Amino acid sequence: MTNILSPEKSENDQELPIRPSYLQEFVGQQQIKENLSVFIKAAKSRNEHLDHTLFYGPPGLGKTTLAKIISNEIGGNFKSTSGPAILKVADLAAILTNLEKNDVLFIDEIHRLNTAIEEVLYPAMEDFELDIIIGEGSAARSVKITLPKFTLIGATTRLGLLSNPLRDRFGIPMRLNFYNTEELKKVLNRASKLLDIDLTDSGSEEIAKRSRGTPRIALRLLRRIRDFAAVDGKSRVDKEISDFGLNRLEVDCIGLDSNDYRYLKFIADNYNGGPVGIETIAAALSEQRDALEETIEPYLIQIGLLQRTPRGRVITIAAFEHLKMPVPNQSHHQFNIFNENE
């Protein structure tokens, strides 16, 4: 599922010129910033490596950026890979044996590591040792390699898929939350200065409130609105051109697009608002379950249009009102579902 409001990173997201390099430049996630600052300063004062860190939460909120910031703050090299890219134990061994003291190893989608890889990772994280088997059959022997003190930073959008043994080895687990409108305005204002865009306060607010609480989406929309302004002969991005461009992009007043409407209307039209199972929804919409759970559902839940229950997905009265559809008579049972299972 790829669209203008997808929180997943795309090849067209040019983030390097505007990506913050240090904690003081990073906007939002205030508690995480403050805690990281303490942990980093404490580790440096003791001349120790920073504890292994796990960032989790919806995509597009800054997990990769924070990992790079940590690398800059502690003065180590930044090495990046992803769970799906590490196919064999040898792949992981090659990465680990090339690390230096205080390096940061960032593993995106860490929940997708297979069990064999995880088992090699455990002693590397705990004891900074790598146990590998050299040779085959009767000639095989175990070799222990000492690794430098490094910091592993994992990132995941699916914390529940991370195995307990791996999760427990992260000394600093941190959840990233959706941004509010004011925080997104700060992100947009900072980016507009770096990109030399004349962005008014009203234009910034219009883009921010339709960005699904996600900086990556806000920055993507800013670039597209800049295009509309340029073609329309406008020198600045104000509320008028922002509203025009966002409507052309089919982004509504609260940040929903056609995919969200398809999702909500399917449940409303076919199941009177639910409950309905996620597999049924995925099959009907011809979408992958993971795409729905990672791209569409988190924001709908965040703004109160969708609820997950033990019996399936249920859209709320607020969702019917936003769709301008009559609320079914039995809608009151949507909330009884929760009361019965609390």
UniProtKB/Swiss-Prot annotation:
<feature type="binding site">
    <location>
        <position position="19"/>
    </location>
    <ligand>
        <name>ATP</name>
    </ligand>
</feature>
<dbReference type="InterPro" id="IPR004605">
    <property type="entry name" value="DNA_helicase_Holl-junc_RuvB"/>
</dbReference>
<feature type="region of interest" description="Small ATPAse domain (RuvB-S)">
    <location>
        <begin position="180"/>
        <end position="250"/>
    </location>
</feature>
<dbReference type="InterPro" id="IPR003593">
    <property type="entry name" value="AAA+_ATPase"/>
</dbReference>
<feature type="binding site">
    <location>
        <position position="216"/>
    </location>
    <ligand>
        <name>ATP</name>
    </ligand>
</feature>
<keyword id="KW-0233">DNA recombination</keyword>
<keyword id="KW-0238">DNA-binding</keyword>
<feature type="region of interest" description="Head domain (RuvB-H)">
    <location>
        <begin position="253"/>
        <end position="342"/>
    </location>
</feature>
<comment type="subunit">
    <text>Homohexamer. Forms an RuvA(8)-RuvB(12)-Holliday junction (HJ) complex. HJ DNA is sandwiched between 2 RuvA tetramers; dsDNA enters through RuvA and exits via RuvB. An RuvB hexamer assembles on each DNA strand where it exits the tetramer. Each RuvB hexamer is contacted by two RuvA subunits (via domain III) on 2 adjacent RuvB subunits; this complex drives branch migration. In the full resolvosome a probable DNA-RuvA(4)-RuvB(12)-RuvC(2) complex forms which resolves the HJ.</text>
</comment>
<dbReference type="InterPro" id="IPR008824">
    <property type="entry name" value="RuvB-like_N"/>
</dbReference>
<feature type="binding site">
    <location>
        <position position="64"/>
    </location>
    <ligand>
        <name>ATP</name>
    </ligand>
</feature>
<feature type="binding site">
    <location>
        <position position="60"/>
    </location>
    <ligand>
        <name>ATP</name>
    </ligand>
</feature>
<keyword id="KW-0067">ATP-binding</keyword>
<dbReference type="GO" id="GO:0048476">
    <property type="term" value="C:Holliday junction resolvase complex"/>
</dbReference>
<dbReference type="InterPro" id="IPR008823">
    <property type="entry name" value="RuvB_C"/>
</dbReference>
<keyword id="KW-0378">Hydrolase</keyword>
<comment type="function">
    <text>The RuvA-RuvB-RuvC complex processes Holliday junction (HJ) DNA during genetic recombination and DNA repair, while the RuvA-RuvB complex plays an important role in the rescue of blocked DNA replication forks via replication fork reversal (RFR). RuvA specifically binds to HJ cruciform DNA, conferring on it an open structure. The RuvB hexamer acts as an ATP-dependent pump, pulling dsDNA into and through the RuvAB complex. RuvB forms 2 homohexamers on either side of HJ DNA bound by 1 or 2 RuvA tetramers; 4 subunits per hexamer contact DNA at a time.</text>
</comment>
<feature type="binding site">
    <location>
        <position position="308"/>
    </location>
    <ligand>
        <name>DNA</name>
    </ligand>
</feature>
<dbReference type="Pfam" id="PF05491">
    <property type="entry name" value="RuvB_C"/>
</dbReference>
<feature type="binding site">
    <location>
        <position position="63"/>
    </location>
    <ligand>
        <name>ATP</name>
    </ligand>
</feature>
<dbReference type="GO" id="GO:0009378">
    <property type="term" value="F:four-way junction helicase activity"/>
</dbReference>
<feature type="binding site">
    <location>
        <position position="313"/>
    </location>
    <ligand>
        <name>DNA</name>
    </ligand>
</feature>
<dbReference type="GO" id="GO:0005524">
    <property type="term" value="F:ATP binding"/>
</dbReference>
<dbReference type="InterPro" id="IPR041445">
    <property type="entry name" value="AAA_lid_4"/>
</dbReference>
<comment type="similarity">
    <text>Belongs to the RuvB family.</text>
</comment>
<dbReference type="GO" id="GO:0005737">
    <property type="term" value="C:cytoplasm"/>
</dbReference>
<dbReference type="Pfam" id="PF17864">
    <property type="entry name" value="AAA_lid_4"/>
</dbReference>
<dbReference type="Pfam" id="PF05496">
    <property type="entry name" value="RuvB_N"/>
</dbReference>
<dbReference type="InterPro" id="IPR036388">
    <property type="entry name" value="WH-like_DNA-bd_sf"/>
</dbReference>
<dbReference type="GO" id="GO:0016887">
    <property type="term" value="F:ATP hydrolysis activity"/>
</dbReference>
<feature type="region of interest" description="Large ATPase domain (RuvB-L)">
    <location>
        <begin position="1"/>
        <end position="179"/>
    </location>
</feature>
<feature type="binding site">
    <location>
        <position position="289"/>
    </location>
    <ligand>
        <name>DNA</name>
    </ligand>
</feature>
<feature type="binding site">
    <location>
        <position position="65"/>
    </location>
    <ligand>
        <name>ATP</name>
    </ligand>
</feature>
<keyword id="KW-0963">Cytoplasm</keyword>
<dbReference type="GO" id="GO:0006281">
    <property type="term" value="P:DNA repair"/>
</dbReference>
<dbReference type="InterPro" id="IPR036390">
    <property type="entry name" value="WH_DNA-bd_sf"/>
</dbReference>
<dbReference type="InterPro" id="IPR027417">
    <property type="entry name" value="P-loop_NTPase"/>
</dbReference>
<feature type="binding site">
    <location>
        <position position="179"/>
    </location>
    <ligand>
        <name>ATP</name>
    </ligand>
</feature>
<dbReference type="GO" id="GO:0000400">
    <property type="term" value="F:four-way junction DNA binding"/>
</dbReference>
<feature type="binding site">
    <location>
        <position position="64"/>
    </location>
    <ligand>
        <name>Mg(2+)</name>
    </ligand>
</feature>
<keyword id="KW-0227">DNA damage</keyword>
<dbReference type="GO" id="GO:0006310">
    <property type="term" value="P:DNA recombination"/>
</dbReference>
